Every structure is written in structure tokens, then in C-alpha cells.
């Protein structure tokens, strides 16, 4: 696997399954953000991936789901869980302090961190 070729591309089914695993099994209020997240992560222009690494793809996924809530509750937890699960599914395990992950999600929600910074942080937490 190279960082440019995910073994498992993102799809809406993956995101829906991730939502089912959250405490309280929150229902989807709006499917639009799920499809937007998938389209963004898989986006290509001029025959090149917009997000050239798994870490940038996971960062774009996290940002999209945090900034465009789609569940009846637990949207921040959902966004983090999806980003981490996407990395793990593609062979990239993370090791991070939970409080720092919470702070990262808050910074994404506030607009203080963009995709590039989030991608670098995810890469820094990678242990595989």
C-alpha cells in the first residue's frame, strides 16, 4: 500500500456502519454531509487525488463531518471515529492522548485547524 492508494476507499456504507457503533445508535438526520464527505475524500482533479495521502483524506473526512453535522447527536465523536477507523482500515493505526484528540476536534470545529495541520497531526500520531 502506498500513501496514495487506499486499500479500502471510503463509501457511505462505511460511515453508516460507524454511526451504528456509537453509543445510543444516533440516527441520521441529514444524508447530505455523508455523501459530501465521501465525495470530498475521493475527489480527483486533473487525474490526481485532491488529498494525496491517507492522513489528508482522514483530515478532510474529519473536517467535513465536524463542520456538517449529520446525526441526531454525537457528531464530533462520529467524525473522530470515522477518521480514525478509515485510517485503521487502510493500515494506519494511531496512538494519541485522548484529551489531545478532543482538542483537535474542537480546533477543527472552530476553524482553528485546517486539513493540512490536521493531516500532519494524524501522521504524528501514526504508529504503523
What is each PLM-predicted segment?
Residues 1-128:
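FIC/Doc superfamily catalytic core
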Amino acid at each position: 500500500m502506498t500513501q496514495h492508494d487506499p486499500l479500502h476507499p471510503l463509501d457511505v456504507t462505511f460511515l453508516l456502519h460507524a454511526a451504528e457503533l456509537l453509543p445510543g445508535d444516533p440516527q441520521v438526520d441529514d444524508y447530505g454531509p455523508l455523501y459530501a464527505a465521501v465525495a470530498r475524500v475521493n475527489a480527483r482533479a486533473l487525474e490526481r487525488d485532491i488529498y494525496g495521502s491517507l492522513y489528508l483524506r482522514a483530515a478532510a473526512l474529519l473536517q467535513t463531518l465536524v463542520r456538517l453535522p449529520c446525526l441526531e447527536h454525537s457528531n464530533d465523536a462520529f467524525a473522530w471515529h470515522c477518521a480514525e477507523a478509515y485510517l485503521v482500515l487502510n493500515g494506519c493505526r494511531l496512538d494519541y492522548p485522548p484529551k489531545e484528540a478532543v482538542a483537535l476536534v474542537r480546533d477543527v470545529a472552530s476553524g482553528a485547524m485546517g486539513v493540512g495541520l490536521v493531516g500532519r497531526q494524524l501522521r504524528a500520531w501514526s504508529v504503523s
